[in-house]
Amino acid sequence: MCSWCWGYRPTWQRLQEKLKTTVEIQYLLGGLAPDSDVPMPDEMQTFLQQTWHKISQQLGTEFNFDFWSRCRPRRSTYPACRAVIIARKYGKEQAMYLAIQQAYYLQAKNPSDLDTLADLAAAIGLDKTLFKEQLTSRDIEQKLMDEITAARNLPIRGFPSLVLETDDRQLPVALDYHHWQTSYDNTISHLQNKTSDLL
């Protein structure tokens, strides 16, 4: 549920394709906002709508602005994060990421709602009843807390972010929303520097 992550998706997909034989790609969830039933303040709704317009203008990203009139926006992203962790257990992490993004940004559905997430889980082939049980389990909550802690310890300032982890270092990777080559070149440079350090 990160607007800029949605905008970055096409470039990220191309970058992943180029890097898949060079590095192992791992996703970390940043958490952002704990569970809440409190309606999102009007100022924040306005700010996020402006952000969507900005991303659309700069990157050509599609957004369905009906979300803001059809749904009851809440600042609550932990449920979506837990949904991804559950899907990961069954090898469907990427499918869940995409399902949540499409529901939120294109279909005007609210991924803060547990019923929405359960429907998405069923749509990607997960057992809906079991998913709903796991979504509120202590085990999944702890895994999310551990992942948020790990993300906060990375050399990043926000999302999306890329980090190259080698044996002894975590190196931030330059991110370019328009050109995958920028991040690719920076990653290769980091790897080459690591090799040089060993010589």
What positions do the PLM features span?
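Short, cysteine/histidine-rich loop/knuckle motifs that typically chelate Zn2+
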Residues: 4
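C-terminal cap of thioredoxin/glutaredoxin-like
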Residues: 8-18, 23, 102-199
